[in-house]
Regions:
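Intrinsically disordered, low-complexity, charged terminal extensions of DNA damage-control enzymes
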Residues: 1-28, 34, 192-379
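Catalytic cores of DNA base-excision repair glycosylases
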Residues: 4-7, 12, 16-219, 230-232
């Protein structure tokens, strides 16, 4: 693949960025020197993986107040890390960032890109973006925005990711010429603001050099990638209380909610039909003197690969059974500080609101299913 010289083509982009760049809390004031705080760049780049800038900013500020440097994060407990990350999603990022901080606090910052790539959670894009912004290394960082900018500028046919190696070689001299940090962030800024999926070509600093714009093909370059249809699921999410506290699922090492506490739940497809009879009769059939069953309107919780229809409910027991397998009773005062994902945090927040809706027969059947898992004895 023969590509035109990137140095003159991208020169207007660097100047444009100096004039319009957004004031983001992790950006250095001086883009001609190494970043004064590489840790801040690391945190921002990990948070920005699959999360929009506007969402990241408040989380970044809170994070830097609580864990202002590598040593503070490395010394933190896992629960503290997950609690501060709660709500940002993709929780594996928090675990990897914690592990990376421990390695960096112990060994110091690597001296090359391969060393950054060896850190937990740093793939080719994140490592290259960190290298360029923090250390002024001319390492091309190619994410969705950068691929889109390059594909339109050069009128690349097909998926530009297939040309990743050629694009890195094309960009590297321009990074060295215009400043790695400045040009890397300029490409990010252009892709996020003007060269978005629906582009605004009028004010674009690269309009005169853009082949896709000249050829009237910006709407077709790059081609839209088909997205997998998320799997559908329906579940009953239950906050069950007793004199000993709340019944919860402790964090696991892997899976969708790894590192987080969650409420017990039952898949709707695993419950029998509600059948005949009254809600009062169904509640009376529950063990352990169940009282005060409540529910709230449900919602749809969306993950990258999954859509969950959630039916939230709560139930208070008069006595405390043994915790079913995989669950644990947690004292009431500990509940607010537990790290939870958005779905479970939402039910925790609902507990503070009064509900006039009783827990219906299906919800009560779900509670029975949770409590029927080998309750060996009362505590």
């Amino acid at each position: 693949m023969t590509l035109p010289d990137a140095i003159p083509i991208l020169a207007p982009l660097a100047s444009w960025f100096d004039a319009v760049r957004r004031d983001l809390p992790w950006r250095a004031a001086d883009l001609d020197r190494p970043h004064p705080d590489p840790y801040a760049v690391l945190v921002s780049e990990v948070m920005l993986q699959q999360t929009q800038v506007a969402t990241v900013i408040p989380y970044f500020r809170k994070w830097m107040q609580r864990f202002p440097d590598l040593a503070a994060l490395a010394a933190a407990g896992e629960d503290d890390v997950h609690a501060l990350w709660a709500g940002l999603g993709y929780y594996r990022r928090a675990r990897n960032l914690h592990r990376a901080a421990a390695a960096l606090a112990r060994d110091g910052w690597p001296g090359d890109l391969d060393g950054l790539l060896a850190l937990p959670g740093l793939g080719p894009y994140t490592a290259a973006a960190l290298a360029a912004q923090a250390f002024q290394w001319p390492t091309p960082a190619l994410d969705g925005n950068a691929f889109r900018v390059a594909a339109r500028l050069l009128a690349l046919e097909g998926d530009p990711r297939r040309a990743a190696a050629a694009l890195r070689a094309w960009l590297a001299p321009a990074l060295a010429a215009h400043g790695p940090s400045r040009l890397t962030q300029a490409i990010m800024e252009l892709g996020a603001t003007l060269c978005a999926p629906a582009p605004r070509c009028g004010p674009c600093p690269l309009r005169g050099a853009c082949r896709a714009q000249r050829e009237g093909r910006t709407d077709r370059i790059p081609p839209v990638r088909a997205r997998a249809t998320p799997r559908e699921a329906e579940l009953h999410l239950l906050a069950i209380a007793s004199p000993s506290g709340w019944l919860l699922r402790p964090p696991t090492a892997s899976g969708l909610l790894a590192g987080l506490w969650s409420w017990p739940w039952v898949a709707a497809e695993d419950l029998p039909e509600a059948g005949a009879g009254t809600d009062a009769a169904a509640e009376a059939a529950l063990p352990y003197g169940a009282v005060d069953g409540r529910s709230w309107p449900g919602w749809v919780q969306v993950y990258s690969h999954l859509r969950q229809t959630v039916h939230p409910g709560s139930l208070r027991l008069a006595t405390t059974p043994a915790a079913p397998a995989g669950l644990a009773w947690i004292p009431d005062p500990d509940l607010p500080g537990l790290p939870m994902g958005r779905r479970d945090q939402r039910l925790r927040d609902l507990l503070a609101r009064p509900s006039l809706l009783p827990l219906d027969r299906v919800g009560l059947a779900a509670a029975r299913a949770v409590l029927a898992t080998d309750p060996a004895s009362d505590l």
